[in-house]
Amino acid sequence: MLMHFDSERPVFLQVAEKMEDAILTGAFEEEQQVPSTTELSVSCKINPATALKGINLLVEDGILYKKRGVGMFVCTGAVEKIRSKRRMAF
């Protein structure tokens, strides 16, 4: 997953937004596993703590969930949650 970041906003917010974009476009479907924070940090060349902070935002919003010892997965209904959140922000 290739990501380019701007210097206007914190990187962890951009990570969360790009993951949401990937879910909306179908790159990650509901109940599908997403890259780990380590994979994300290596592919994006960012600190693992930054990747984790972005992912944790999505967990808090109910877009991703963690399966202990397995990884992170897209929640059922995540697409609608993202759309609703973005409509509210607009």
Explain the meaning of each model-derived region.
Residues 27-28, 32, 59-69, 75-76:
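Beta-hairpin "wing" of winged helix-turn-helix
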Residues 33-65:
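N-terminal helix-turn-helix
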Residues 1-33, 39, 85:
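Extreme N-terminal segment that seeds HTH/winged-HTH DNA-binding domains in transcriptional regulators
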